[in-house]
């Protein structure tokens, strides 16, 4: 697909600002923020985040405030209606997803399961 669309996976301002900072530190304006789902964690599935300078043909690309978020079609089905956020606190800093589709999460919040 590899086209820019409006999609029900949102980014908070906090996530956008952190992504922009990290891309600037890498000095590569072509980087995009990839969100994906993998098997693993104590609840069966877990979120992954990485930077990627290529968009695969089947990827969905979502642009917001100059940040391009990319998601593969398999991961996308688990992320519908989700919100990508970023927080900094005493326990460290991290990207995370608020996902309305999740049935259960592990205590650390990095893995989840769905029905």
From Swiss-Prot:
Binding residues annotated for iron-sulfur cluster, in chain numbering: 42, 106, 108
The record's free-text note on cofactor binding: Binds 1 iron-sulfur cluster per subunit.
Gene Ontology BP, a term: iron-sulfur cluster assembly
Domain of life: Bacteria
Molecular function terms, GO-annotated: 2 iron, 2 sulfur cluster binding; 4 iron, 4 sulfur cluster binding; iron ion binding
A Pfam family that the UniProt record links to this protein: Fe-S_biosyn
InterPro entries with a match to the protein in the record: FeS_biogenesis, FeS_cluster_insertion, FeS_cluster_insertion_CS, FeS_cluster_insertion_RrpA, HesB-like_dom_sf
Signal peptide (residue range): none
Cofactor: iron-sulfur cluster
Protein keywords: Iron, Iron-sulfur, Metal-binding
UniProt key word Metal-binding: yes
GO cellular component: cytosol
NCBIfam families: iron-sulfur cluster assembly accessory protein, PRK13623.1
Entry function: Required for insertion of 4Fe-4S clusters for at least IspG.
Family listed: Belongs to the HesB/IscA family.
Subunit field text: Homodimer.
Annotated protein name in UniProt: Iron-sulfur cluster insertion protein ErpA
Species per Swiss-Prot/TrEMBL record: Baumannia cicadellinicola subsp. Homalodisca coagulata
């Amino acid at each position: 697909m590899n086209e820019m669309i409006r999609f029900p996976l949102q980014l908070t301002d906090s996530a956008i600002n952190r992504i922009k900072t990290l891309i600037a530190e890498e000095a590569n304006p072509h980087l995009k923020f990839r969100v994906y789902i993998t098997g693993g964690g104590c609840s069966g599935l877990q979120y992954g985040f990485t930077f990627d300078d290529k968009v695969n043909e089947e990827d969905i690309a979502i642009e917001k405030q100059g940040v391009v978020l990319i998601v593969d079609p398999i991961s996308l089905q688990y992320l519908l209606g989700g919100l990508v956020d970023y927080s900094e606190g005493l326990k460290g800093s991290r990207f995370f997803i608020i996902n309305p589709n999740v049935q259960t999460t592990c205590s650390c919040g990095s893995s989840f399961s769905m029905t």
